[in-house]
Amino acid sequence: MQDIVQDALDNAEAEQREMDGDGDGDEFGDPRIVIVGCGGAGNNTVNRLYNIGVEGADTVAINTDKQHLKMIKADTKILVGKSLTNGLGAGGDPSMGERATEMAQGTIKEVLGDADLVFVTAGMGGGTGTGAAPVVSKIAKEQGAIVVGMVSTPFNVERARTVKAEEGLEKLREKADSIIVLDNNRLLDYVPNLPIGKAFSVMDQIIAETVKGISETITQPSLINLDYADMTAIMNQGGVAVMLVGETQDKNKTNEVVKDAMNHPLLDVDYRGASGGLVHITGGPDLTLKEAEGIADNITERLDASANVIWGARIQESYKGKVRVMAIMTGVQSAQVLGPSTQKQADKSRRELQDVDSKQRAADDAGAGGFGGAHSDGGQDEVEQENGLDVIR
């Protein structure tokens, strides 16, 4: 038996060297992953991702603010709603951001045409990000992609932005397969004494690392592989998702890395009873099968008994003596994302807006002699022509 084990070890080393040498082979093709940043916060995340580099993913920045877009680095940049905003932004009005993005849907369809997995990142509560994210998600879904929303919510003191964020989250949840929400209020607990610019950069970095981790889990070869089909099986279950990331160099890897992952600083969720879980473990050549299985087991033990759990593992020389775990749990419960109080507020806000719209329509009908006040932008072709898009690739 010892001879068999030794032969297996020798063969495994030879196979690993061959796989490492063949890592760039592309004859079978890879899923196309696109990361779309909407509005100021989304653009900042895309800019950070572009700078740190994401293997196998394209970055797209969409904004109504021309000056901010100029400062962003991305594979593709799209200025939307130029005829509406003159490139000066949406003024904190989500309906303006929504309309501007709808005007550019022909261009966005072209950019996302062959995408398999699309991340849509934005800050909820502003104008462009809140309005654009659901539109981009809808377009990506219609093109056949799996869509994951990755958004942050405003501080509690920003009351008007909070109401807008709730309504935006409701729309995004309807259009995306899953949404991962990070709470800006947690920055007050996590990095209370950092200068405000650096504190927000922490949020950008966490979102960027999350997207990078998911993307490279799919595109990079692993010992126990996770592929696009696995991601689809988990993300298709929809709802709110949570991303857990942990890393340790402790000798007790199995417990410590899970403990580190559980202490996620920026999302208040209870993932007991989650409907799905995808776990990816990265370790050095010293990572044992028992340790890897133990980590996957510990991090998923609170999930529902019928939860669909898929796990994989990758060995990297640079991780010798340490281990990293990345987990996505879908179908979790979060008071931040349309919990009872949030849903009630969103319903109330929507009713108030509908009442205002109804009164306005009645007034328009009366002024038009009863022929109705309906009007359009002249159809998609005309709107596209008037939009004055700036697309930089």
UniProtKB/Swiss-Prot annotation:
**Compositional bias annotation for Basic and acidic residues:** 345-364
Name the SMART domains for this protein.
Tubulin (SM00864), Tubulin_C (SM00865)
Biased region (Gly residues) positions are 367-376
GO terms for biological process? cell division; FtsZ-dependent cytokinesis; protein polymerization
The record lists GTP as bound by: G40, A41, G42, N43, N44, G127, T128, G129, E158, R161, D204
Region (Disordered), start-end ranges: 1-28, 339-393
List locations, semicolon-separated.
Cytoplasm
Keywords of the record, alphabetical order, are: Cell cycle, Cell division, Cytoplasm, GTP-binding, Nucleotide-binding, Septation
Disruption of the gene: reported phenotype? Deletion of the gene does not affect the growth rate but causes drastic increase in cell size together with morphology defects. Division is strongly impaired.
Q: What does induction of this protein depend on?
A: Part of the cdrS-ftsZ2 operon. Transcript levels fluctuate depending on the presence of CdrS, growth phase and chemical perturbations, indicating a growth-sensitive mechanism of transcriptional regulation. Transcriptionally regulated by CdrL and CdrS.
Which Gene Ontology terms cover its molecular function?
GTP binding; GTPase activity
**Coiled-coil boundaries:** none
Q: State the PROSITE patterns in the record.
A: FTSZ_1, FTSZ_2
Q: Which InterPro entries match?
A: Cell_div_FtsZ, Cell_div_FtsZ_CS, FtsZ/CetZ, FtsZ_C, Tub_FtsZ_C, Tubulin/FtsZ-like_C, Tubulin/FtsZ_2-layer-sand-dom, Tubulin/FtsZ_GTPase_sf
Q: Which Gene Ontology cellular-component terms appear in the entry? A: cell division site; cytoplasm
What this protein is reported to do is described as:
Essential cell division protein that forms a contractile ring structure (Z ring) at the future cell division site. The regulation of the ring assembly controls the timing and the location of cell division. One of the functions of the FtsZ ring is to recruit other cell division proteins to the septum to produce a new cell wall between the dividing cells. Binds GTP and shows GTPase activity. Essential for triggering the constriction of the cytokinetic ring during exponential growth. Required for normal cell division but not for cell elongation.
Q: How does it assemble?
A: Homodimer. Polymerizes to form a dynamic ring structure in a strictly GTP-dependent manner. Interacts directly with several other division proteins. FtsZ1 and FtsZ2 could also form copolymers whose stoichiometry is balanced by CdrS regulation.
Similarity comment: family membership: Belongs to the FtsZ family.
This protein is called Cell division protein FtsZ 2
List the source organism.
Answer: Halobacterium salinarum (strain ATCC 700922 / JCM 11081 / NRC-1) (Halobacterium halobium)
